[in-house]
């Protein structure tokens, strides 16, 4: 996996078996490390197929954790199969972490460094060194610049260097997120934009990240801002989810998607007047037709501001406002 994230089928020999733990003489399974989750998959031998549910590193030894008691025996030749979809998503999130960091440096300044990071299948985050909270406008600029870097299909060079040579060639900025042990360092170089030592599974060019969508930013401590994002398939799923939220809300408000923010504002004002202030409006009909000119993400942000909620609660909040408004109106008529 150091050279090619697509290396998901390999052959090896069983070196040790202890309960559900198996060690092979060589493996392509990635262990949880560097803020990145482990691979999963199967080890297949002459006696059956064993499901691998966890991978960890004990010293220099990579240990495979099986779901059940292993069928493989010490000395047996086996074949390993790694879950390709999971590996791809984790590689996309890991390389996207470097891409987002590079984009943030372009937008916010050269003081930006990675303090730490985490990459899971569902999402990833990068903790950036920055003196202030990042505004929504700057987040949008960072997202746009990250996707621009994807469109450029910048080569990502993965190479091991002796520590001294790496430091002399690339400078001490390679140590982002803390010092790395060992006489040799694996350098991940997004040519011209970001260089750091890293041991994770990485793409071979930025284009393979496909898309990056920033979800939020929050301050975790003084001088550290956490940016949470998704990439690749996870980014497309997030975008699809946002589209579904807007479509469902538009149906509830009986309007076009672009009119949702205006209708949501109108509904909120009616609800506040009737339910909170106990003043019944003359009509419950929503008439606002003003069209929102921003992106779907900006539309969701606007509706969240109006409702004072989060995107996943927009539909339920709309349903609640409509229901409570109707109930209050009907009780007043009685």
Regions found by a protein language model. Give the residues of each.
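A generic structural motif
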Residues: 84-88, 130-134, 218, 231-235
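Active/ligand-binding-proximal structured segments within catalytic/core domains
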Residues: 28-43, 73-128, 222-224
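Conserved nucleotide-binding/hydrolysis modules and their immediate coupling elements
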Residues: 1-81, 85
């Amino acid at each position: 996996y150091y050279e090619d994230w697509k290396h998901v089928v390999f052959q090896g020999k069983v070196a040790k078996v202890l309960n559900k733990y198996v060690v092979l003489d060589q493996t392509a399974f990635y262990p949880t490390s560097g803020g990145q989750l482990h691979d999963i998959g199967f080890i297949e031998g002459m006696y059956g197929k064993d499901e691998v549910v966890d991978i960890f590193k004990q010293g220099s030894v990579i240990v495979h954790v099986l779901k059940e008691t292993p069928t493989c025996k010490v000395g047996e030749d086996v074949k390993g199969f790694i879950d390709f979809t999971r590996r791809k998503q984790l590689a996309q999130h890991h390389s996207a972490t470097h891409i987002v960091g590079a984009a943030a440096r372009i937008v916010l300044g050269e003081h930006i460094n990675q303090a730490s990071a985490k990459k899971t299948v569902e999402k990833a985050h990068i903790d950036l060194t920055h003196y202030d909270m990042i505004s929504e406008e700057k987040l949008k600029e960072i997202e746009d610049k990250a996707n621009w870097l994807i469109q450029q299909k910048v080569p990502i060079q993965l190479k091991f260097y002796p520590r001294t040579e790496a430091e002399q060639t690339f400078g001490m900025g390679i140590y982002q997120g803390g010092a790395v042990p060992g006489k040799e360092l694996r350098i991940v170089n997004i040519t011209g934009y970001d260089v750091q030592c890293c041991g994770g599974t990485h793409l071979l060019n930025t284009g393979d990240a496909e898309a990056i969508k920033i979800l939020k930013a929050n301050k975790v401590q003084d001088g550290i801002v956490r940016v949470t994002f998704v990439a690749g398939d996870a980014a497309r799923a997030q975008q699809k989810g946002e589209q579904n939220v807007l479509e469902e809300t538009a149906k509830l408000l009986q309007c076009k998607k672009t009119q949702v923010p205006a209708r949501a504002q109108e509904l909120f004002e009616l609800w506040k007047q009737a339910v909170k202030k106990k003043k019944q409006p003359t009509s419950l009909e929503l008439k606002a037709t003003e069209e929102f000119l921003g992106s779907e993400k900006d539309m969701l942000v606007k509706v969240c501001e109006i409702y004072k909620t989060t995107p996943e609660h927009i539909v339920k909040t709309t349903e609640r406002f409509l229901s409570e408004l109707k109930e209050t109106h009907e009780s007043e008529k009685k």
